[in-house]
């Protein structure tokens, strides 16, 4: 059975790139552009993995990761965080919030797929 991946990404180009790449590798993909909808969408879609942009309008991806960890229905879903604004200490904060993996943009296709497959096993 194909794995389900939800992508929370406000940038349409990145969302399309991640979606097309994962779909080409036989994943079932759901995209969410508005982070405010991410938690409810995750409950409905029940993904095996969430790919979370950290810099989102209206809500921080970091806050969403922390909220997922506090929600009984979502805390077991692994999160791969991606961000264009990788500063000193960001990876530590993101991993401490509960992310299972971290990538800084721009992300190479190979590193992205390795990270996804590494988390999903």
Language-model segments: which ranges?
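Charged docking surfaces used in two-component/phosphorelay signaling
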Residues: 16-24
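Acidic catalytic/metal-coordinating carboxylates
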Residues: 13, 34-37, 60-66, 111
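The feature encodes the CheY-like receiver
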Residues: 57, 66, 75, 87
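Active-site beta3 strand of CheY-like receiver
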Residues: 45-51, 56
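Conserved acidic carboxylate
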Residues: 9
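Alpha4 helix (beta4-alpha4-beta5 surface) of REC/receiver domains from two-component response regulators
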Residues: 19, 63, 86-103, 111-114
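Short hydrophobic/Thr-rich beta-strand motif most characteristic of the beta2 strand and flanking loop
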Residues: 26-33, 41, 103
